[in-house]
Amino acid sequence: MEKNIKSDLPQSHMEVQGVLCKTFYKKFGKEALPIIEDVFRRWGKVLGERMKQKLGDMDFKTAALTYIEPALHREPKAEIIIATGTRVEMKAYACPYLLNGHGKEICEAMMAMDSEIIGTIIKDKIKLELPKSLAMGDEYCHGIFIKLEQ
């Protein structure tokens, strides 16, 4: 019995964030999305500043690849599709927030953190596109980070 209870519990801080956001979204609907996005964007700024302080100055490609790198070592491993000075594309086969099938809107709200982290590191604007997403029911996430021209 104990084993079944544990399997229903979040196993990481990211899973806890996902459960909290899904619950908040379920209760408050679309009104919750700007709040979720704002909180995750602000947290992304904090994390980006910490990474920049630790790692120093770097270009967009290096910052994006450095940020993505842990996902390349977790099972199932993410893949880099392309990495240039203005565009980094990846495929991920597992959602750290457990958003599978919960919709693109909540995914995009939570992923505001990721583009903010990279943007803060390089002091530039980043756009994240998600043409495929586990949250939308796709078999993988296809994330595209794009450095915007100023």
Residue ranges and their predicted role:
Residues M1-E89, Y93-M110, D124-C141, I146-Q150:
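N-terminal accessory segment detector
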Residues M110-T120:
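A short, contiguous, amphipathic alpha-helix enriched in charged residues
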